Swiss-Prot record:
Pfam family of the protein (one): tRNA_SAD
Cofactor note: Binds 1 zinc ion per subunit.
Record EC number: 6.1.1.7
Protein name: Alanine--tRNA ligase
Residues where Zn(2+) binds: H568, H572, C670, H674
GO cellular component term of the entry, any: cytosol
Needed cofactors: Zn(2+)
Amino acid sequence: MEKSSSSLIDPPSLSGDEIRDAFINFFVQHNHKKLASSSLIPDDPTVLLTIAGMLPFKPIFLGLKESSTPRATSSQKCIRTNDIENVGRTARHHTFFEMLGNFSFGDYFKKEAIQWAWELSTEVFRLNPQNIVISVFKEDLEAEQIWKEVVGVDANRIIRMGAADNFWSSGATGPCGPCSELYFDFKPELGSDEIDLEDDSRFIEFYNLVFMQYNRDLKGNLEPLANCHIDTGMGLERMAQILQKKSNNYETDLIFPLINAAALLAQIKYETTNKKNKTSLKIIGDHCRAVTHLICDGVSASNLGRGYILRRLIRRMIRHGRLVGIIQPFLPQLAEIAIELMKNAYPQLLEKKKIILNELKIEESRFLETLERGEKLLAEITSHECDLISGAQAFELYDTYGFPLELTEEIANEKGISVDINGFENEMAKQRKRAKEASVSIDLTEEGSIEREISLFDDTRFEGYEKLETTSTVIGIFKNNESVKQAVQGDLVKIIVNRTPFYAESGGQIGDKGLITSQDLEVSVENVRKKKNIFIHSGIVNTGVLEINSSVQMNVTPSFRQRTTSNHTATHLLQSALKLSIDSSVSQRGSLVSNHRLRFDFNAPKPLTIKELEDMEARINQWINEDHLIQIKTMPIKEAMAAGALAMFGEKYGDVVRVVDVPGISMELCGGTHVTRTSQLGTFKIINETGIASGIRRIEAIAGPSVLDYFNERDLVVKELSKSFKVQSYEIVERVSSLQLELKDKTKELIKVKNELALAKALGLATYAKSVGKSKLLIRRLDGVDGSGLQSAASSLIDHLGKYSAVIFGGIPNQEIDNKLVFVAAFSPDLVSDGLHAGKFISGVAKMCGGGGGGRPNLAQAGGSQPQSLDLALEKANENLTQQLS
């Protein structure tokens, strides 16, 4: 019998919040430090989002960072989309989930981890021991012995598994180890003779214990770690399913209120609706939690990286809403419920509520504008007797209507139709480069000598706030990513010193430039980055020899720092002006501060007007002229936030922060360099405002010395234009407008002439029309004529040929520019009455050339992208029409 004091067979029904609290409190009582959930935007550049509870501790497991505590416990919010097609369709797949975990960093190991896991499961959550099955790695005899002899689990309820299931590693090299998993058995009455843990109708894994005790080297050998670690994870949603006695995670109190709210909006009942509707409602409930947290943590919808994931989830919510009958906008309404459900565990949701709801409102309204048109086009495509949506059609849905490829695939699959993925990717490659999504695995492999060695240095002392020069000692030199003792003239190097005045690239501000010198040495520093608090100076040795442990003079270029500093302070003023002039909910989505200019990205539903831009510019220049003192303070982050300081979404801050305060105007958490008075900026000028993604705008501006450069460049351009147009500077606009009108008129004349030539050429082709039964059919290749010219020619030929006539043209309008194809089909009214449809016919022809299109029954146009297939497509069109007209 298991050694457990649990006498209750039926576990209590705890809410999701109660389960979370019980887990955390249990480990706090066992001397674990409670840690708040990390952001969904991880520090780790190898992953887009936080995908596991252990991800925030990766540097500790790698030995790159010391832990502040030997034991920790947390409830970590996570996002995974690699199994998105299973969300809503299985009992336990989610995009957003919470992972409860307890961690040991070289402190306790297997015995304690196993005992506490059992105690928590049977005494805190009061699970019946007969409902628990244990899996162990088949070679981990130590863990199996602890389960049997210390905990007292019956041998027939301990299952030995292979490395594929019970040996944890996430790369070819690095820390790894066996794991042991706890499964809940919903049907213990079936006995333990033939336990199949793959049977998810009977078993659910709810707790995973990873014993990180080895390091795998490049040859695959396992060496014991000097310090062994414990990494565990309990899925909150899974434990809620068990304790609340539900058949799936979705019907727990963590998610079901969202599902029920969506059902009410759809005017259906979840309990009695069909399986398809239930799946859609589950997807809506799951995705709502995900998008709410993503926006809260600073992600904005876009076509790149994290933004693309957010946009994809939002658009799937909208589409599944329509599938169950929700036509009106509903995302903000549902997000309010999500915030209410999760506010106790994540109070920042309330703080960011306005931003979350506004982002969802903007993105939903934008997508609804195009969704209906896109759905109609997709319905038209799939209504034909076809088994494949071409890559060009899928790309048109993506590029024109905002349909993610996955959404097109999902709709097509529901109709039993495939999508040409390769064709879509070819179209994408021609027109747009999109950032590749990072791997969803956690990489704990060897990171290369420079990353490993740099992490071993002491922190660099930064003195650049107070001065631009300092004497320092060289403590590290890297050449070709290898540590060296010295570097000579011409060598590209990375240099680490014990102290530096050089600002390292961070917070949107670029790194300083300057020189490192000694008696005969000169190194040009072109950029400075930092890893944690170790500054890495990249540059080239101009003269002399750079040696380890040598004393050097560090010199930042003053003019470079002055320009960068001016643009950084101006960035703070710009954000304040945006909030005052546009909306207080405007927030920073990204920035770049260089010596030439500043770039500021922010959320906004529409372009700013000229007047809004002028008002902001005037407001900022007024603040500059008022000569405000800029105060820089260091204080606890809680005190700074209470005082109203702004923090950038997605940025990581410590317990103590640096605050840049322009009293009454701006207060931000910032580690960048700034002027001491606003008057030092001189002038501020906005040079551009544009959209970079749906709901995201970008302002480019300049301040300080950069403004003079800008006006000098503009003056030179004006002088050159005046000289070229032979007019005074004030007459340039009028002259350009006049030339534009002339060009427009000439273009119209050219099109007219080309169409007349096409018509004349086409009428000359009338003799090539062949008789097919009672009909006349003309199919020809006609290059050098655009779509409108071909349509005009085809219409005239129909009139010329008379009743029962059909004309098909295909060609390359302009081979000098590209090889894009254009097709035109024209049918006489009597052929249309007989059932022929020009739009459908020409669409089928274009598909053979990687294109698509359509139009009216009597006249239609399509395009293509594969000129090598043009002649064959026209030949097939001839065969098809000849057969139909015979």
